[in-house]
């Protein structure tokens, strides 16, 4: 087919575009062509076309010494885009070394920090990733129209790290920082970054419905536009998954986790892969019947860590997975140990504090002093207040009503299903008084959750008391009967009575047989 037979689908488009170019040439409008050049670089970088990116970048590079250094910088960027992290780092190491003290070194450091921020993130090295990202943002070198996009994506990366770590203050800072970036050209990519950060802020605040809507929209737009590699919307897909979990849409959350897991393999993101593995275990650990499978998987992940020293940054994720399991089986000592060795991870510290609140209730005034600025804080505070019998039944119902109504507005279900059976029963009773389809559905889920939990302590014969279950847990340890008594603050004579009742109810003859039953019920 000849060129003359090809026509534009839009009347006058070809001639109009040609006229724009002719006018730019006539006016010697170099900025017009520079913006076209930059726009093409951006598109190639976001769509994972590293080789084409490098070729296009080289079209503006001369043979001067500075030009040759810039060529190497663009080569490093191209390797980042093509996910060859090792080669990218080797080029950057050489560039930094050879340009020390040179005028072009600040530009090299900007490129290096941008690349290393992304590489360190995907390798799970958050401290270095944050350091490099902030250094790149604060670089004295600016790159014209590319700069707002670079800054936006780096702030988005910082926000993602802080979301994973549950550092709410830093998430809010990112939400503020992104609004301070000027966008005179109306760059869509910067708008996407703003939306992504807003979805992460909403998720952290407990506004799950709004977070889901925004994050899902960003995922659809960016994946349709071919965003891949380090530019893939993994952060927003993570938000979508978290929201689905909080909605108690478990099958959908697991399905999306598998999608993100497959994408992480394609995009060579070790951290996202392990995050998906642990995310799946967290979801499965909500069901007592799956705890055996989850415990086995945790041990398999630990073995992988031991065999591969490069995975050391994933160790806290595996500890996190075990915390979910041990929380479900009420193994407080092990949870405290895991929390203690991950004291530098805000999310793990948060889990530890929450766990201690469940077992060592604060006084009423302390709970009333808790903040309620976000949806999550309001729900959590009123759930805790509803547990104080000293407030009286009417006041307890009022607290729970506030929590439930805010939960319906925010789409928060799972936070209620995590509560003790007494609170679940209160929700069931409340559903009979409030006219809400959402609450009716939550009530049915509460009934199912109580049934699941009860299977854990059904032994076939006469049921053990809660105190007897606590003693049974310790029988599989190396502690003597006297030591168990001291740990649980039980007198010697009372311990003898507990042991006698446990053996009788379980129809066993000795401590070893009782321990085997405890293990089969996943109490230890």
What does each model-found stretch correspond to?
Residues 46-55, 59-67, 118, 159-162, ...:
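Alpha-helical linker/edge segments of TPR/alpha-solenoid repeat scaffolds
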Residues 23, 43, 78, 119, ...:
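Residue-level signature for tetratricopeptide repeat
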Residues 470, 478-513:
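Recognition helix of helix-turn-helix DNA-binding domains
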Residues 1-107, 118-131, 162-173, 204-209, ...:
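Inter-helical turn/loop elements of alpha-helical hairpins
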Residues 29-33, 64-73, 103-115, 142-157, ...:
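Alpha-solenoid helical repeat architecture
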Residues 473-477, 519:
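Short, locally clustered residues in the helix-turn-helix/winged-helix DNA-binding domain
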């Amino acid at each position: 087919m000849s060129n003359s037979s090809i026509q534009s689908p839009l009347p006058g488009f070809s001639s109009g575009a040609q006229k724009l170019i002719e006018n730019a040439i006539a006016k010697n409008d170099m900025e017009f062509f520079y913006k076209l050049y930059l726009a093409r670089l951006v598109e190639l970088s976001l769509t994972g076309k590293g080789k084409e990116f490098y070729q296009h970048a080289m079209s503006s590079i001369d043979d001067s010494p500075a030009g040759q250094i810039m060529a190497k910088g663009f080569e490093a960027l191209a390797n980042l885009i093509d996910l060859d992290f090792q080669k990218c780092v080797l080029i950057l190491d050489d560039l930094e070394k050879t340009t020390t003290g040179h005028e072009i070194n600040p530009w090299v450091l900007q490129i290096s920090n941008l690349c290393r921020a992304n590489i360190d993130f995907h390798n799970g090295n958050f401290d270095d990733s944050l350091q490099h990202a902030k250094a790149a943002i604060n670089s004295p070198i600016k790159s014209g129209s590319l700069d707002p996009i670079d800054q936006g994506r780096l702030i988005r990366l910082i926000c993602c790290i802080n979301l994973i770590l549950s550092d709410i203050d830093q998430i809010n800072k990112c939400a503020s920082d992104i609004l301070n970036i000027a966008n005179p050209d109306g760059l869509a990519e910067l708008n996407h970054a703003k939306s992504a950060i807003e979805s992460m802020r909403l998720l952290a605040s407990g506004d799950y419905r709004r977070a889901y809507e925004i994050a899902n929209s960003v995922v659809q737009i960016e994946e349709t536009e071919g965003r891949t590699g380090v530019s893939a919307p993994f952060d927003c897909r993570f938000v979508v998954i978290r929201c689905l979990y909080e909605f108690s849409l478990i099958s959908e959350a697991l399905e999306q986790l598998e999608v993100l897991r497959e994408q992480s393999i394609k995009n060579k993101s070790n951290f996202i892969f392990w995050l998906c593995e642990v995310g799946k275990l967290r979801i499965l650990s909500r069901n007592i019947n799956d705890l055996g499978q989850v415990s086995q998987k945790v041990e398999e992940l630990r073995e992988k860590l031991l065999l591969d020293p490069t995975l050391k940054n994933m160790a806290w994720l595996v500890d996190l997975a075990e915390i979910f399991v041990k929380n479900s089986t009420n193994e407080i000592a092990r949870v405290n140990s895991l929390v203690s060795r991950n004291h530098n991870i805000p999310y793990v510290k948060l889990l530890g504090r929450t766990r201690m609140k469940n077992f060592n209730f604060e006084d009423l005034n302390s709970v009333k002093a808790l903040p309620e600025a976000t949806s999550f804080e309001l729900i959590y505070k009123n759930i805790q207040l509803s547990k104080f019998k000293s407030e009286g039944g009417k006041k307890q119902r009022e607290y729970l009503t506030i929590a439930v109504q805010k939960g319906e507005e925010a789409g928060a279900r799972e936070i209620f299903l995590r509560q003790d059976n007494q609170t679940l029963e209160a929700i069931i009773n409340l559903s009979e008084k409030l006219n809400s389809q959402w609450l009716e559905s939550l009530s049915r889920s509460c009934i199912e959750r109580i049934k699941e939990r009860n299977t854990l302590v059904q032994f076939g014969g006469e049921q053990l008391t809660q105190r007897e279950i606590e003693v049974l847990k310790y029988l599989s340890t190396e502690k003597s009967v006297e030591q168990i008594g001291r740990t649980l603050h039980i007198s010697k004579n009372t311990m003898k009575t507990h042991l006698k009742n446990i053996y009788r109810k379980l129809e066993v003859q000795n401590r070893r047989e009782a321990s085997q039953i405890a293990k089969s019920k996943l109490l230890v």
